Amino acid sequence: MNVMFVDDQASVLEGIAAGISFQDLGIDVVRYATGAERAMEIMSSVPIDILLCDIEMPGEDGLQLISRAQKLYPELITILLTSHADFEYAQISVRLGCFDYIVQPAPYDVIEGVLRRALQHCYERRKRNQLYEVGKWMQTGEMELLDRVAMNLFSSDTSDVQSSM
């Protein structure tokens, strides 16, 4: 799984990098960006599964970043990190479909707990998608088999029918 943190304060990103054991969580790649534009550049070159970002940043804020990123990457799980416990932000995050909302400063174990839940959600979604694809493949295979049997039923040679089964 690939995760990205976006915050305009480098010290916050450094603290997260030092305080969270990403390897223990099963996270393969962790990227950091200090602004929305850099985050979008990274997402265009590296698939990101989970995006955690600050709300208030210069230029494009975290809410705008999430809105834009979700349009391009609808499977992206988004989590807001903010030092503002503003109810309006919480409402907007719900409307945007954010997975969670973490008020900073948050202990690392709280962030890790949210990441664990988000990772579990990713794994479950991937399993559902794989099952769906297998089901589609099986359905297509069954239809192809039925088509071959039906075509061979109309042939005059009965060995053709037996060979299609």
PLM features: residue spans?
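Two-component/phosphorelay signaling modules centered on CheY-like receiver
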Residues: 10-31
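Receiver (REC) domain active-site loop signature in two-component systems and cognate sites
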Residues: 57
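Interdomain helical linkers/hinges and coiled-coil/dimerization scaffolds
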Residues: 103-165
